């Protein structure tokens, strides 16, 4: 019996690992254009700010597609659905590799975004289902760790491959790794019937929960602020701080490494006081942005700011995801779809705001605008906490 229990625990951990690796792949491909922005712009003879709108397009497709596509797929067995999503993901990356102009690249990114919109709508609840008994929070933490590793390994490696070969090779490598992940899913995951996915009728019920709605608005505000600055951090480091491309790569690595710390801190401290944890995470996101321009030429200060910023954004994302699941236990997939949509409204809006700031004011001002949105997010969080009695 002991061997059976140990075998079950090992298999469950392997399944959680597959989901964590999947999160790594999806987050890497969503954000790797940030690390390749200058190279993509150069290859198509465009400005970085204009190419940055591909981040906005991707995010807004996810925002618009998350809920309706989740509802359309609500009754589909989850393992089969995941394998279909990875098939679409891989084919779209092949199109990215052969893209002969910027519009074809955008079309390929649309396919990836559609897969992304369903994947993140169902993954949080699935990783909890396959987790070892009593390890649900840790499983969610490992899922967040996969996302963080995308920043630690995915973005820097994507940038290195882009510099050594070209940006197309980066997308090709991501597609190849995705194929391996799909094979692991096919091999390791059991049949996963749809459960507590929720239906269209769940929406009015969820929208009557003011704290939940407030959390969604908080996500939009906080993530918009973050991506106003982060979407253009690579050109900021090179053009404004005037650091070398190698330093920019290292800073992206540090940002992702900080995400591991954020995942650890979530597992250690979130349950003790969720309100204070979320507030501290917001502060860690907004302060480095507000101070970014002031210390633009002090390399060690920028490294420190980026490290704290990375801790903050990872801690914030996973804690808000957990809060949503806690507030909507009877419709987890619908609630997660709205969360994913809200998050990507923030990504798209942030990338758009950043582009507008660059064109109207200049690249150096992105941190001020991003930080100001972060301040609004902090005020909003304090308001909904007091108004609706967050526990």
Swiss-Prot record:
Kindly list the residue ranges recorded as spanning the membrane.
16-36, 51-71, 82-102, 103-123, 138-158, 170-190, 210-230, 247-267, 277-297, 300-320, 338-358, 361-381
Give the similarity note: Belongs to the major facilitator superfamily. SotB (TC 2.A.1.2) family.
Quote the subcellular location field of this record.
Cell inner membrane
**Molecular function per GO:** carbohydrate transmembrane transporter activity
Lineage: superkingdom? Bacteria
UniProt name for this protein: Probable sugar efflux transporter
NCBIfam families, from UniProt? PRK03545.1
GO cellular component annotations of the record: plasma membrane
Q: Which UniProt keywords apply?
A: Cell inner membrane, Cell membrane, Membrane, Sugar transport, Transmembrane, Transmembrane helix, Transport
Disulphide bond pairs = none
Function description: Involved in the efflux of sugars. The physiological role may be the reduction of the intracellular concentration of toxic sugars or sugar metabolites.
Q: How does it sit in the membrane?
A: Multi-pass membrane protein
């Amino acid at each position: 019996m002991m061997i059976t229990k140990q075998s079950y625990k090992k298999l469950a951990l392997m399944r959680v690992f597959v989901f964590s690796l999947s999160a790594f792949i999806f987050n890497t491909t969503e954000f790797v254009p940030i690390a390749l922005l200058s190279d993509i712009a150069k290859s198509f003879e465009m400005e970085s700010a204009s190419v940055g709108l591909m981040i906005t397009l991707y995010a807004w497709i996810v925002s618009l597609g998350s809920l309706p596509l989740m509802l359309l797929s609500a009754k589909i067995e989850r393992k089969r659905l995941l394998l279909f999503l990875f098939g679409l993901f891989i084919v779209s990356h092949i199109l990215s590799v052969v893209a002969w102009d910027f519009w074809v690249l955008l079309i390929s990114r649309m396919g990836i975004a559609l897969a992304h919109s369903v994947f993140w709508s169902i993954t949080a609840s699935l990783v909890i289902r396959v987790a070892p008994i009593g390890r649900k929070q840790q499983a969610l933490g490992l899922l967040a760790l996969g996302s963080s590793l995308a920043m630690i390994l995915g973005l820097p490696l994507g940038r290195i491959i882009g510099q050594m070969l070209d940006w197309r090779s980066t997308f090709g490598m991501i597609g190849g790794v995705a194929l391996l992940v799909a094979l692991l899913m096919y091999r390791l995951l059991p049949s996963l019937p749809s459960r507590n996915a929720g239906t269209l009728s769940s929406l009015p019920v969820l929208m009557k929960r003011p704290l939940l709605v407030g959390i969604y608005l908080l996500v939009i505000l906080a993530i918009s602020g973050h991506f106003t600055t982060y979407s253009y951090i690579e050109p900021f480091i090179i053009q404004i701080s005037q650091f070398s491309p190698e330093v920019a790569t290292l800073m992206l690595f540090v940002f992702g490494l900080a995400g591991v710390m954020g995942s650890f801190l979530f597992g250690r401290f979130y349950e003790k006081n969720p309100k204070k944890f979320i507030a501290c995470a917001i502060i860690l996101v907004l302060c480095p942005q507000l101070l970014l321009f002031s210390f633009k030429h002090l390399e060690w200060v920028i490294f420190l700011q980026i490290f704290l910023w990375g801790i903050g954004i990872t801690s914030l994302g996973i804690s808000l995801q957990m809060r949503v699941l806690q507030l909507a236990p009877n419709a987890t997939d619908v609630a997660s779809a709205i969360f994913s949509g809200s998050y990507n409204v923030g990504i798209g809006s942030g990338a758009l705001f950043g582009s507008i700031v660059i064109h109207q004011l200049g690249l150096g001002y992105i941190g001020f605008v991003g930080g100001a949105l972060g301040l609004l997010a902090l005020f909003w969080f304090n308001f909904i906490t007091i108004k609706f009695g967050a526990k």
